[in-house]
Amino acid sequence: MHAHCLPFLLHAWWALLQAGAATVATALLRTRGQPSSPSPLAYMLSLYRDPLPRADIIRSLQAEDVAVDGQNWTFAFDFSFLSQQEDLAWAELRLQLSSPVDLPTEGSLAIEIFHQPKPDTEQASDSCLERFQMDLFTVTLSQVTFSLGSMVLEVTRPLSKWLKHPGALEKQMSRVAGECWPRPPTPPATNVLLMLYSNLSQEQRQLGGSTLLWEAESSWRAQEGQLSWEWGKRHRRHHLPDRSQLCRKVKFQVDFNLIGWGSWIIYPKQYNAYRCEGECPNPVGEEFHPTNHAYIQSLLKRYQPHRVPSTCCAPVKTKPLSMLYVDNGRVLLDHHKDMIVEECGCL
């Protein structure tokens, strides 16, 4: 994880958003006489300003390559961002083609989608581009719509399995040889977007933690052509303190007699509540279950150590304690929540 570069990345992206909001112009493109369409940045800005979020995560992938041959349409995208399990709610192709496309009056379109990792800049310019087929399916003309000047094709079903099982693409790449495509002298300019609207899986919701950290990891892996989540975890553990001094759960024995509660608590008289102690690294990793706020704070702490306080080692998961005690002459059995620390993290 190149966490030391993230603040500069965030700053550059924010500057781009500000500049794009002020100067972005509609592309002079037309599709079957439709009006010109807003640029990808302008479209994402319109979603950003939408007061009603459509999904937890909305991604726009610009096509690496596009081929339209009659009723056979081929699209290549870089899916290297795949890392965490997500539930795909909706996926659509938004086409802003540079020349008019005459759709057939009947029949269907054959759509083929490939994963094409961004080429290694160190490879020879005459080397081929490797592609891996993700799906081949048909789209009926009734599924083709127009929105904001773009031709829109709904492609949720073919792509949902890849987001549901992100490791499947990596396994396929290791098992099946990809197709070799000649590398163009200059990157092709395409105006085809794949819009992915996805929600965090139930497992991710239960785990909690920093969604921003996951996205930062995903962004860096995509830039470096890495698909493995483990890759990011291994490379993030540099410049850490001694692991024995990091935030962790330690024993913490509670004796109710010492605090004067032993007269009315029947059982237990003592129990191990555990507590949290230790340092929080900067930046903090997902193993410490940071919130988004804590993750940003830990990044700033690394660059401004004298101005920003460290995140605190504190309980992030607790469990109840069953207690038998006397209350107004009655013996009660009650389960009191948040009495025992199960996991510690940096908040």
From Swiss-Prot:
Q: Name one GO biological process term.
A: somatic stem cell population maintenance
Glycoprotein found in the keyword field: yes
Q: What Pfam family is a match, any one?
A: TGF_beta
Q: Name one GO molecular function term.
A: type I activin receptor binding
What Gene3D superfamilies has UniProt attached to this entry? Cystine-knot cytokines
Annotated signal sequence is 1-26
**In which compartments does the protein localize?**
Secreted
Q: Which GO terms describe its cellular component?
A: extracellular space
Q: Which residues form the propeptide?
A: 27-237
Q: Which CDD domains match?
A: TGF_beta_NODAL
Q: Which residues are modified by glycosylation?
A: 72, 199
List keywords of the entry alphabetically: Cleavage on pair of basic residues, Cytokine, Developmental protein, Disease variant, Disulfide bond, Glycoprotein, Growth factor, Heterotaxy, Secreted, Signal
Q: Describe what happens upon changing residue 275 to C.
A: In HTX5; decrease in signal transduction
Would I find tRNA processing among this entry's keywords?
no
Note the SS bond partners.
247-313, 276-344, 280-346
The source's domain of life comes to Eukaryota
Entries under PANTHER family matching the protein: NODAL HOMOLOG (PTHR11848:SF159), TGF-BETA FAMILY (PTHR11848)
UniProt record similarity statement: Belongs to the TGF-beta family.
As annotated, the protein's associated disorder is:
Heterotaxy, visceral, 5, autosomal: An autosomal dominant form of visceral heterotaxy, a complex disorder due to disruption of the normal left-right asymmetry of the thoracoabdominal organs. Visceral heterotaxy or situs ambiguus results in randomization of the placement of visceral organs, including the heart, lungs, liver, spleen, and stomach. The organs are oriented randomly with respect to the left-right axis and with respect to one another. It can be associated with a variety of congenital defects including cardiac malformations.
Relate the protein's function as given in its record: Essential for mesoderm formation and axial patterning during embryonic development.
Q: How does it assemble?
A: Homodimer; disulfide-linked.
This protein is called Nodal homolog
**Species whose genome carries this gene:** Homo sapiens (Human)
What's the name of its gene?
NODAL
